[in-house]
A protein has these predicted regions:
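Interfacial helix-loop-helix linkers and transmembrane-helix boundary segments
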Residues: 78-85, 141-144, 200-206, 262-265, ...
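Transmembrane-helix bundle of Major Facilitator Superfamily
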Residues: 2-192, 328, 335, 341, ...
Length: 533
């Protein structure tokens, strides 16, 4: 990250530093909250528009699709044309799209506006962290990033609660409309208090081809998966869009290999440890994406919870993560990542099995809290070692690239899970309005997600090397392991990966965050890649 002159950089305790933090946290919080808040609103949206379950899926996947496909591009645009400029553009874009969501006259219009929201999120999310990295003096940078990650994680975590409250006291439309006044505050603060930075050495040749093929590939596959259950198996539209998706993804791989400045450099997958850790990420976040999408509906349609009660259901995960994630990082530092990465998914799987108790007349403290607490325990053990392994598996100068790729993998996993899982378990059409039908499908979905987590545990046990982590990998930096715990909380609660992607916070650090793209939470100190990784 290109830094302004030393005299222009700010300290953590300075007034301007706090304004920069406010703009960054509120901005990233907009995207984080909107990734989680909508799950709680799905039954209300379905009732108002009288649509089937596939339309509700698109309400989620349209946002994730554009966000996952374009977030690396958004970071590159900020590097080249100014991080504050692209951040502010993203916030304005996001606010306008939010107004379109809140005023949408139909489900189709809402889905289109959600896709536009994802584009705004892809523009603002990378810049929120990059502005902090470039603006603060090196000795305060880790502390500032810790505040950003912790408060941003909390913002993401309260999304379902906020959504439930707004739905109960107003309307689901306010889930989106509330973004507009917040965006005005962010823009005013950013324009007045955040310095402009860019990378003068960065290339202005943006990988538009890669971004386009990524959107087309993920979009084609997502449409085919969601549309297949409601169309004949011989439907040309389904087969054609699926084929376009596959061909586009193949083309994406070819294009990224040939590009001089690729959006996703494929060479980093030459590390076996990096590839294995991302495979574990895909399985784990696929399971979480599917569960959290369906659980919010299950609690309302089957268990009879209000939107507010359903929104509070996952808050215990946040508490557990805040309290215990640092311990998971410390354990991985002492004994290596293999055991935490193997045991964590198994504990999460046990939590999901306990969710099978959530049915008709389920009670919050006896049927919902126990599985959620067990799930939080597994996540606290898993996430910090997983992300540290991703970063340690490649050379330290590519830490930002690795974080961005891991972020994209996690988002893509959730996207595919939300698209595919309901179809596999028979949740289509009006099934979300029939408690018995939805309960049956939910339980089958839980078992599938348990299988994914068991596969992730087996993959970690058989492929992850304990030697991949150096002594300074997890929790040894100025930010400390608490940074890992704070950021992880919000990320996992919603399936949104809110996190820290930071270079060393020590004096004289000049490490660069590639595109400043945030991924799942990572340690501030990243060791060089180990031989044989």
């Amino acid at each position: 990250v290109t830094e302004p002159a030393v005299s222009a950089q700010v300290t953590f305790r300075s007034s301007r530093g706090r304004w920069i933090l406010l703009a960054s946290i509120l901005g990233s919080g907009l995207a984080g909250i909107d990734a989680t808040v909508v799950n709680v609103a799905l039954p209300s949206i379905g009732r108002d528009f009288g649509v089937g379950f596939d339309s509700l899926q698109w309400t989620i996947t349209a946002y994730t699709l554009t966000l996952a496909s374009l977030i690396l591009l958004g970071g590159a645009l900020g590097d080249s044309f100014g991080r504050r400029r692209i951040f502010v553009l993203g916030v304005i874009w996001f606010a306008v799209a939010s107004l379109l969501c809140g005023l949408a006259p139909s489900a189709g219009a809402l889905v289109g506006a959600r896709a536009l929201q994802g584009i705004g999120g892809a523009l603002l999310t990378p810049g929120s962290l990059a502005m902090i990295q470039a603006s603060f003096v090196p000795e305060d940078r880790a502390r500032a990033i810790g505040a950003w990650s912790g408060l941003g994680g909390v913002a993401t975590a309260i999304g379902p609660f906020l959504g439930g409250w707004l739905i109960g006291f107003a309307s689901w439309r306010w889930v989106f409309l509330i973004n507009a006044p917040l965006a005005v505050v962010v823009v005013l603060v950013a324009q007045r208090h955040v310095p402009e930075t860019r990378d003068p050495a960065g290339s202005h040749r943006i990988d538009v081809l890669g971004a386009g093929l990524g959107v087309l590939g993920l979009g084609g596959l997502t449409y085919a998966i969601i549309a297949a259950p409601s169309h004949p198996i011989s439907s040309a539209g389904v087969w054609l869009t699926g084929l376009v998706g596959v061909v586009s993804l193949v083309g994406f791989g070819v294009a990224e290999r040939r590009q001089q400045h690729p959006m996703m450099p494929l060479t980093i997958f030459s590390s076996a440890q990096f590839s294995a850790a991302n495979a574990v990420t895909f399985l784990v976040y696929g399971a979480f994406g599917g569960v959290f999408f369906l659980l919010a509906v299950q609690l309302q349609v089957v268990a009879g919870f209000s939107a507010l009660a359903a929104g509070t259901a996952l808050l215990p995960i946040t508490v557990v993560m805040l309290l215990l994630s640092a311990r998971g990082g410390q354990l991985a530092q002492r004994i290596g990542p293999r055991l935490p990465m193997s045991l964590g998914p198994l504990i999460c799987a046990a939590g999901l099995l306990l969710m099978l108790r959530i049915g008709r007349h389920a009670r919050y403290f006896t049927d919902v809290v126990p599985p959620v607490l067990v799930l939080g325990l597994g996540l606290a053990l898993l996430v910090a070692p997983l992300t540290a392994t991703v970063l340690a598996a490649i050379d330290s100068e590519h830490a930002g690239v690795a974080s961005g790729v891991n972020n994209a993998v996690a988002r893509a996993a959730g996207l595919i899970a939300v698209a595919a899982l309901p179809a596999v378990v028979g949740l289509t059409g009006e099934s979300y309005t029939h408690a018995d039908v939805f309960l049956h499908g939910f339980r089958k979905a839980i078992l599938i997600c348990v299988v994914l987590l068991v596969l992730a545990a087996g993959l970690a046990a058989s492929t992850i090397s304990n030697s991949v982590l150096g002594s300074s990998t997890v929790g040894s930096s100025a930010a400390g392991p608490s940074t890992l715990g704070s950021s992880t909380a919000g990320a996992v609660v919603a399936g949104e990966v809110a996190a820290v992607a930071a270079a060393s916070g020590g004096p004289g650090s000049t490490d660069r965050l590639h595109c400043a793209v945030d991924g799942p939470p990572l340690s501030v100190d990243v060791p060089a890649r180990r031989d044989g990784a």
